[in-house]
Amino acid sequence: MQAIILAAGMGKRLGELTKNNTKCMVEVDGVRLIERALRILDRKNLNRIILVVGYQHENLMAFVNSLGIQTQIGFIINEVYDKSNNIFSLSLAKEQMIEDDTLLLESDLIFEERLIDMLLEDKRDSLALVDKFESWMDGTCMLLDENDCIVDMVAKKNLHFVNADQYYKTVNIYKFSRHFSKYTYVPFLKAYAMAMGNNEYYESVIRLIAMLDTKELQARRLNGQRWYEIDDIQDLDIAESLFTDNTEEQYKKITARYGGFWRYPKLVDYCYLVNPYFPTEHMLEEIRANSDRLIMQYPSGARVIRLLAGKLFGISDKKIIVGNGAAELIREMMQETNGKIGFVTPTFEEYINCCKQEQRVIMDTRKMDFSYSGQDIQDYFEQKHIQMLVLINPDNPSGNYIDSREIYELIHWCKKKKICLILDESFSDFSDEAESCIADSYLELYDEFYVIKSISKSYGVPGCRLGILAGRNSEKLDQIQRKLPIW
């Protein structure tokens, strides 16, 4: 068994990172892609490893030769790397392909060692590694039958996302038997390159072979094993979070993304609290039915959205504004004072992060078993001279809940002390008590009482970025509205 690595490409989409080096010289977690791949292959007792190089090949060859790889290394240089595609690079290695069984892989991949073992352990002669297609994946896909035979190869331009659950993405790691290479793949490779030219992809040859229905090449499906194809800066950023060996560092890199966790299929999110029962299928169908209109036309402006929000919550549109998620409204509200601001911790940190260190007055509830009442809050802040009090109710992450009677009393206490009270009830729909403070019976109690609510949590639509701010002080709401975008 030998390995052939295609490493001639320029990697233009990686910008400055490939200005003086080819794509496989990019580092992930401090290790270059090519080194990671070669170290894995070096442990598999292969007869040789052949690299087809091109762009910046001197740097690449010098680096590879410095690694001390025990397996024999050979190089083939593609001198026209800037005028050809990977079908030409592979054709340069066609004579080597027919001399031995071959592991074929592309150099812009990062993958765990288990992927290579799966191919080597599988008794079938010729295999393509595939993974279940996900919406962010790019490139050629396959359709498979129940016996893992390749029914069709689907080019990127021909993908139909309504059929996404039927697709398998090629990992771009293959095992070709010598017999398959000599009598099937290489002859078709020669013919296809001659007919179509050198600016094509070697996967097109596999598609032709699949159409013959000889079932010589089958698929080996992955089941959660890690891999990533690195084409651009975003891919590199994701790979950094997937392939770091330091668990704490991995946690930091993933949480710093603040979402997009669908790219981590095994991740279980205990942080972002979203209603798992919404949206309903009927609601999703309505969104899908209107998606063309929603995407291709300008939406209604802020004035209309305020009308709709007021109708939804049963209050005047003058008492409510809508933001790009609650986060946008939180930032604006926290800038309304330069004085001291009271917080009950641990809590949702977006509020704390929006004010200066010297403004923060913290009521730490760790010694209270994270349980506190409205009276506890009054007692603690009575002599603290705060100008604003922030309360998340129910709180996140403690889950502490202050009932409506205590909230009523807290509003009156803040009014007496002339303290601006911000109540975040984004999680109130998860509590036993159904009563919301976004109602005239509460808002009319005090000019400086405001309620913030994230629509994401209760309705299960965090991607829609909707939050509301309600209060009696329409002058301040209008002032904040003027700072926000029209849409």
Identify the meaning behind each predicted range.
Residues M1-K19:
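N-terminal nucleotide-binding beta1-loop-alpha1 segment
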Residues Q2-I5, V31-T102:
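Conserved N-terminal catalytic core of the sugar/cofactor nucleotidyltransferase
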Residues E112-M196:
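Conserved core of the sugar-phosphate nucleotidyltransferase
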Residues M118-D122, Y372-H385, P397-V461:
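Active-site pre-lysine segment of PLP-dependent enzymes
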Residues C149-V154, L445-W487:
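Conserved core segment of the aminotransferase class I/II
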Residues S241-Q297, H385:
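N-terminal "arm"/small-domain region of PLP-dependent enzymes with the aminotransferase-like
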Residues Y298-P299, G310-E332:
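Short loop-beta-helix segment that forms the pyridoxal 5′-phosphate
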Residues Q335-I392:
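PLP-dependent aminotransferase-like
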